[in-house]
């Protein structure tokens, strides 16, 4: 009995049954700016704006339209226009096919007639998922036709820009779209119609140097990258350090290139108010 007190007790370790639950892909999203882990449903409810730091995630064209126009009012224009391979580059067609499959779009821009809080407008939305929304012949043609439709129907034109610039696979033909879209906007202005340009992240290259900069009212989303060449390219060229926030929406507003910075949750309301003022002025 006494020896039993000094004997080492024998224990059986029982491992609890634990089922490792796999979290379905896409339930949580990490903020690119602050690193916060966000519940995707909550992020979507907040217009894809980070609830902690206000970072604006990029949107697809379909998401942008759903957030901006009245439900069921969007009627797409020129959906059948498809890009071709003018210089027979070996990889271009496969890149187009891949972009169509991954985005559900035929090109990097959606155009259509819609209503915003009941106010009619022609709406253009670029989608950076499609080859960084580079501007080729079809993108330029669709934007030109949208401007012409706005002029013919005496409706305001709203363009949401997002682009990496001209589409290099279409060479000089892509650069010609800069002049083409600008000419169409000039004709729209002659008709006395309002053109609102909304700059989203990123708006660069030939798009920033053409139609995106020509709005009667230029709006930008917070933190959007806006400029012709990227900051790194400029720094390497001039061999100087650029100011903090250079080419961001806030910097451009301070220097007069942007009229308004509008957070995404207030975008529809702001556009409706501007359309209302314009229509009152026409009466």
UniProtKB/Swiss-Prot annotation:
Gene3D superfamilies assigned: 2-enoyl-CoA Hydratase, Chain A, domain 1
Top EC group: transferase
One Gene Ontology molecular-function label: acetyl-CoA carboxylase activity
Domain CoA carboxyltransferase N-terminal span(s) in chain numbering: 27-283
Protein name stated in the entry: Acetyl-coenzyme A carboxylase carboxyl transferase subunit beta
Keywords for the protein's UniProt record, in alphabetical order: ATP-binding, Cytoplasm, Fatty acid biosynthesis, Fatty acid metabolism, Lipid biosynthesis, Lipid metabolism, Metal-binding, Nucleotide-binding, Transferase, Zinc, Zinc-finger
PROSITE patterns listed in its UniProt record: COA_CT_NTER
Entries under InterPro entries matching the protein: AcCoA_carboxyl_beta (IPR034733), Acetyl_CoA_COase_Trfase_b_su (IPR000438), ClpP/crotonase-like_dom_sf (IPR029045), COA_CT_N (IPR011762), Znf-ACC (IPR041010)
Cofactor note: Binds 1 zinc ion per subunit.
Lineage of the species this protein comes from: Bacteria, Bacillati, Bacillota, Clostridia, Eubacteriales
Coiled coil ranges: none
GO cellular component, one term: acetyl-CoA carboxylase complex
Pathway noted in the entry: Lipid metabolism; malonyl-CoA biosynthesis; malonyl-CoA from acetyl-CoA: step 1/1
Domain of life: Bacteria
TM annotation in the entry: none
Catalytic activity: N(6)-carboxybiotinyl-L-lysyl-[protein] + acetyl-CoA = N(6)-biotinyl-L-lysyl-[protein] + malonyl-CoA
One Pfam family recorded for the sequence: Zn_ribbon_ACC
Cofactor(s) annotated in UniProt: Zn(2+)
Binding site for Zn(2+): 31, 34, 50, 53
Cited PANTHER family: ACETYL-COENZYME A CARBOXYLASE CARBOXYL TRANSFERASE SUBUNIT BETA, CHLOROPLASTIC
Subunit structure and binding partners: Acetyl-CoA carboxylase is a heterohexamer composed of biotin carboxyl carrier protein (AccB), biotin carboxylase (AccC) and two subunits each of ACCase subunit alpha (AccA) and ACCase subunit beta (AccD).
Enzyme Commission code: 2.1.3.15
GO terms classed as biological process: fatty acid biosynthetic process; malonyl-CoA biosynthetic process
Organism field: Pelotomaculum thermopropionicum (strain DSM 13744 / JCM 10971 / SI)
Localization annotation: Cytoplasm
Location, primary (coarse class): cytoplasm
